[in-house]
């Protein structure tokens, strides 16, 4: 069952859902909360490799992915430019904490999509028990460069109450790849390949 604005306010007041910094009333929609763009990005550095092997036996190594991506910090009153056909990772300003009986769903804003910006390419579900800032997967599928500025409203998170708490809350898992993230982290696909 999706949570309404009334439910979201109640869950936040009870401390069941935490968003830090706390959103203003103008950020709470009928069934979602707007999140803002942070100042940290990761971009692929061209020319490092000819391709990325996603599966064994050639499988990608974690340190190899780190080497493929550069880290970009955007200062106050500056913009991050995403050119047509480019992909980048970004992060929300807000840290989000969910209980074991609530999942989140992240969606881009329609107004930005109409300009060619995909805000979250895949993996829209935020697992129950999540605690951290949220990495965004940007792609510019439009014809013009897009200037994104820290602090702008970039996406919305909605919440769904589970019928019962999960036995595997994300932050409690010793193998959770992205728990407590505070910056956009590159893929940790390599940690999947032992399974």
From Swiss-Prot:
Pathway: Pyrimidine metabolism; dUMP biosynthesis; dUMP from dCTP (dUTP route): step 1/2. Homotrimer. InterPro entries: dCTP_deaminase, dUTPase-like_sf, dUTPase_trimeric. Catalyzes the deamination of dCTP to dUTP. The active site is at residue 137. Keywords: Hydrolase, Nucleotide metabolism, Nucleotide-binding. It catalyses: dCTP + H2O + H(+) = dUTP + NH4(+). SUPFAM superfamilies: dUTPase-like. It is an enzyme of class 3 (hydrolase). DCTP binds at residues 109-114, 127, 135-137, 170, 177, 181. GO terms for biological process: dUMP biosynthetic process; dUTP biosynthetic process; nucleobase-containing small molecule interconversion. GO terms for molecular function: dCTP deaminase activity; nucleotide binding. This is dCTP deaminase. It comes from Rhodospirillum rubrum (strain ATCC 11170 / ATH 1.1.1 / DSM 467 / LMG 4362 / NCIMB 8255 / S1). Coiled coil: none annotated. Belongs to the dCTP deaminase family. Its EC number is 3.5.4.13.
């Amino acid at each position: 069952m999706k949570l309404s604005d009334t439910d979201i306010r109640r869950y936040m007041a009870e401390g069941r859902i935490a968003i830090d910094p706390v959103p203003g009333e103008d950020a709470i929609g009928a069934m979602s909360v707007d999140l803002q763009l942070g100042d940290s990005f990761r971009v692929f550095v061209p020319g490092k490799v000819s391709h990325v092997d996603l599966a064994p036996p050639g499988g990608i190594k974690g340190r190899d992915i780190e080497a493929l991506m550069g880290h970009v910090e955007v200062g106050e009153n500056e913009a991050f430019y995403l050119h047509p056909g480019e992909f980048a990772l970004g992060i929300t300003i807000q840290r989000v904490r969910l209980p074991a009986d609530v999942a989140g769903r992240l969606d881009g804003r329609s107004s930005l999509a109409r300009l060619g910006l995909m805000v979250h390419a895949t993996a829209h579900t935020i697992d129950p028990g999540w605690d951290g800032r949220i990495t965004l997967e940007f792609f510019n599928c439009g014809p013009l460069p897009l200037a994104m500025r820290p602090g702008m409203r970039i996406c919305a998170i909605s919440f769904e109450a589970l019928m019962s708490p999960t036995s595997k809350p994300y932050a409690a898992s010793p193998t959770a790849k992205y728990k407590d993230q505070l910056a956009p982290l590159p893929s940790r696909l390599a940690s999947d390949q032992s399974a």
